[in-house]
């Protein structure tokens, strides 16, 4: 039965042993505190005794008898006595200073006694706390609570605030005697507060118990006696601001708070080791801070150590920043300067024009002889492949590019540079861009107005070899001056040369039509006008001809759909000359062109969504080529030449904005004005004796603004995407050109109608170039004005395949002979 009662005894002992242990530690703490206070009082008494003794010595020295005795001794050569007196005088001065310090310290000692009483009470309350909890407390390691918290009751607050001035003065004057100096310089050779004196007393009396004392004093409200020996050295060093101008000495009331501020250099350097505040607590002082009493070598070593510690993360951070910046620069859009940045080398990856919506790559076959200067090299890069990849997202930036290229080509107009390029590059690019790859070189070549050529353009039946010839032609023609036009003519295809007789050109092997009048017109080049347009409007820049070819039936195969637009009669399509317009408005020509440069082009994507299906419809207006018979050519050579000149203008692709996006469109004309203008035009045509089925040249005052680059007509380039319609009107007779417009993939009665280019023109030639819709749907009763001149035939009803928007516009001007059939 004995083991049974023995079992609860160890359990009770285990329960009571922590309490007894804690009580024992509390008692020992109180005992050590009492002994420390007694030692302090003993030290004060000793100082008082020393003071009294020194006073006696001073009085004895200063008495008259002693002075005379001293003088006599000095005369007799009692040197040891005189030296002793000097030593005593020095001690007296030191003791006076020490007394002043002790007077100030008395108040501090009283406050320290109160603090010790509070800590003893705290120890009695927190007896049941374990050592692990006290050790893992993170507040002492922060250096804030024990050094700067004014309400925490810590010793360091009072000591730093009360004794900082005293200790700094005492240390500078070395007022303490040897035992006190050893106590105050125990930690790092620097003068400390009265807490160091207490620590020294404790260290002298009980060295073996200092560990527990420090651990117990590292409670939430601990004094700085233990902290002074164990804290991180950065809390005991001088503060140097980052700019190096301000230096704060160590004993200052706000030192602990300032150390934690990022404004100071030492806190930044100390952060490297601040990750482990409790493990690395006993680092040397020369690792992280500057102690005034240490060696200069140690200071330099500490600074080198700190700089080496800080340089590693700084260099890695710089490398990381550079890497991030390089990635950002690669991904970011390039800064678009005024001039396009081109390269003259033959590397295809480097010769990219990174400007706006243009991307012209330079192939390996580029001849380097053209790179005479920067401007010629830019033109070489532009014409090297004859390809333009139009970016639909950045087309508003073309305004600046077009202005820049305009001025560049004006300067390089007199610098001929002829180059030919292999055709394999064009074949490679044709699969990407279909037939959009020649407009830029065509427009620039025509803008020179210097090479006289003629040809017919078959728009869609383009073979790779034909595209190769086209690129050769465009690149060799763009920089040719008038004097060199006949010398360079062997570079051109056979059918492009200028011959006096009219030759019949087959539409299958003709690609391009260059023409210019022999009277050279000083017109600035207009090359970047159509850069932002769609593929349909880009293609139409090629559909201009110079000579009239007899009528023939021809089919145009479209890109995206396999429909054919059959053209039976193309003998009545008529292009007007604008030679008179250029002569009359010669001073306004440059003004008009500079204004048109600023007009932005609209892509088909900007239009309504119900018209996107109609993107494939290409205009047949310019495919129906006007023709002259040899008799007419011989009879009116000036008119032929002026006609060729006017069609050179119409080669520049004219783009149109939708009406709701343009602010300068014109008003609708009244029916009286339309009737008067139409009757006047018919009277002029009949006065010139036009023949059946043959286009006569229109007199000079009626030049077409839609064949001119300054026109901004909605019908000139983007009509198929705006309206997508086929307007077929009846003619009054065979001689009347009062006929139709055919646009797109019409499946209505095209085989019964005639093509008239006049209905797409307007006699109004002001700069705004807006659309007058009534001139395109000329179905108003104009017969009343011209009844005497026109032969009347039976009226036939017309079927119009129109969209909803077109129907609304036609309904405003409908007549009795118009039947609307809306198919969309």
From Swiss-Prot:
Tissue specificity: Expressed both in the dorsal lip in early gastrula and throughout the posterior presumptive ectoderm in early neurula. Expressed in the dorsal neural folds at the tailbud stage and highly expressed in the tadpole head, including the brain, retina and cartilaginous branchial arch derivatives.
Description of post-translational modifications: Phosphorylated by CaMK1D; the phosphorylation requires binding to dvl2/dsh.
Sequence ranges of Basic and acidic residues compositional bias: 16-33, 520-530
Signal peptide interval: none
Alphabetically ordered keywords of this record: Coiled coil, Cytoplasm, Developmental protein, Neurogenesis, Nucleus, Phosphoprotein, Wnt signaling pathway
InterPro entries on file: Dapper (IPR024843)
Coiled-coil region list: 84-139
Sequence motif: PDZ-binding, positions: 821-824
Similarity comment: family membership: Belongs to the dapper family.
Subunit structure: Interacts with dbf4 and tcf7l1-A. Interacts with dvl2/dsh; the interaction is required for dact1-b phosphorylation by CaMK1D and seems to become disrupted by the phosphorylation.
Name of this protein: Dapper 1-B
Source organism: Xenopus laevis (African clawed frog)
Organism phylogeny: Eukaryota, Metazoa, Chordata, Craniata, Vertebrata
Gene that encodes it: dact1-b
């Amino acid at each position: 039965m004995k083991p049974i009662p023995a079992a609860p005894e160890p359990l009770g002992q285990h329960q009571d042993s922590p309490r007894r242990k804690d009580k024992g530690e509390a008692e020992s703490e109180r005992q050590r505190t009492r002994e420390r206070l007694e030692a302090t009082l003993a030290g004060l008494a000793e100082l008082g005794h020393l003071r009294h003794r020194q006073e006696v010595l001073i009085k004895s020295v200063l008495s008259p008898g002693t002075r005379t005795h001293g003088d006599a001794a000095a005369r007799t050569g009692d040197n040891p006595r005189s030296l002793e007196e000097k030593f005593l005088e020095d001690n007296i001065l030191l003791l006076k200073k020490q007394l002043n310090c002790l007077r100030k310290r008395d108040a501090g000692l009283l406050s320290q006694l109160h603090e010790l009483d509070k800590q003893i009470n705290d120890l009695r309350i927190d007896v049941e706390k374990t050592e692990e909890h006290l050790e893992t407390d993170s507040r002492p390691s922060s250096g804030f609570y024990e050094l700067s918290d004014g309400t925490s009751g810590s010793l360091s607050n009072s000591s730093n605030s009360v004794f900082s001035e005293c200790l700094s003065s005492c240390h500078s004057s070395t007022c303490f005697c040897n035992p006190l100096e050893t106590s105050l310089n125990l930690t790092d050779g620097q003068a400390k507060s009265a807490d160091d004196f207490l620590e020294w007393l404790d260290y002298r009396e009980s060295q073996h118990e200092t560990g527990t004392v420090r651990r117990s004093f590292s409670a939430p409200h601990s004094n700085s006696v233990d902290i002074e020996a164990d804290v991180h050295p950065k809390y005991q060093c001088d503060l140097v601001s980052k700019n190096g101008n301000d230096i704060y000495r160590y004993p200052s009331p706000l030192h602990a708070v300032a150390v934690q501020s990022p404004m100071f250099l030492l806190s930044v350097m100390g952060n490297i080791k601040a990750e482990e505040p409790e493990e690395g607590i006993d680092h040397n002082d020369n690792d992280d801070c500057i102690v005034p009493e240490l060696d200069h070598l140690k200071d330099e070593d500490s600074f080198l150590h700190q700089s080496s510690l800080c340089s590693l993360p700084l260099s890695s951070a710089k490398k990381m920043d550079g890497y991030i910046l390089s990635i950002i620069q690669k991904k970011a859009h390039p800064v678009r300067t005024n001039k396009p940045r081109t390269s003259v080398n033959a590397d295809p990856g480097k010769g990219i024009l990174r400007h706006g919506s243009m991307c012209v790559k330079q192939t390996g076959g580029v001849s380097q002889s053209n790179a005479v200067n920067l401007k010629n090299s830019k033109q070489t890069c532009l014409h090297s492949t004859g390809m333009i990849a139009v970016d639909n997202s950045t087309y508003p930036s073309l305004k600046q590019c077009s202005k820049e290229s305009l001025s560049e080509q004006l300067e390089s107009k007199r610098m001929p540079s002829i180059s030919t390029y292999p055709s394999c590059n064009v074949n490679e690019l044709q699969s990407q861009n279909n037939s959009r790859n020649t407009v830029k070189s065509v427009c620039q070549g025509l803008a020179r107005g210097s090479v006289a050529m003629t040809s017919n353009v078959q728009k869609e039946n383009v073979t790779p070899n034909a595209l190769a010839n086209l690129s050769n032609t465009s690149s060799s023609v763009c920089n040719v001056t008038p004097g060199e036009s006949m010398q360079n003519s062997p570079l051109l295809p056979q059918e492009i040369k200028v011959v006096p007789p009219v030759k019949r050109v087959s539409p299958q092997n003709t690609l391009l039509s260059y023409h210019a009048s022999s009277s050279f017109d000083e017109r600035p080049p207009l090359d970047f006008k159509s850069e932002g347009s769609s593929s349909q409007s880009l293609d139409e820049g090629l559909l201009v001809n110079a000579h009239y070819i007899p009528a023939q039936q021809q089919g145009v195969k479209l890109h995206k759909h396999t429909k054919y637009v059959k053209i039976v009669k193309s003998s009545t399509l008529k292009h007007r000359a604008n030679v008179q317009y250029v002569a009359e408005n010669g001073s306004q020509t440059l003004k008009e062109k500079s204004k048109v440069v600023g007009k932005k082009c609209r892509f088909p994507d900007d239009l309504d969504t119900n018209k996107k299906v109609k993107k494939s419809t290409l205009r047949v207006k310019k495919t129906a080529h006007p023709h002259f018979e040899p008799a007419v050519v011989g009879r009116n050579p000036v008119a032929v030449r002026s006609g060729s000149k006017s069609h050179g203008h119409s080669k520049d692709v004219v783009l149109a904005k939708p009406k709701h996006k343009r602010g300068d469109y014109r008003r609708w004309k009244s029916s009286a004005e339309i009737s008067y203008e139409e009757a006047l035009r018919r009277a002029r045509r009949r006065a010139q004796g036009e023949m059946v089925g043959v286009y006569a040249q229109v007199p000079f005052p009626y030049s077409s603004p839609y064949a001119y680059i300054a026109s901004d007509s909605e019908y000139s380039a983007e009509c198929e995407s705006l309206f997508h319609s086929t307007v077929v009107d009846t003619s009054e007779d065979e001689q009347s050109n009062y006929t139709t417009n055919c646009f797109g993939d019409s499946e209505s009665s095209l085989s019964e109608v005639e093509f008239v280019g006049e209905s797409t023109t307007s006699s109004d030639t002001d700069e705004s170039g807006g659309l007058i819709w009534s001139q395109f749907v000329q179905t108003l009763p104009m017969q009343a004005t011209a009844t005497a001149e026109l032969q009347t035939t039976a009226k036939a009803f017309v079927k119009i395949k129109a969209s909803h928007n077109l129907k609304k516009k036609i309904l405003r001007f409908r007549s009795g002979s118009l039947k609307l059939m809306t198919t969309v």
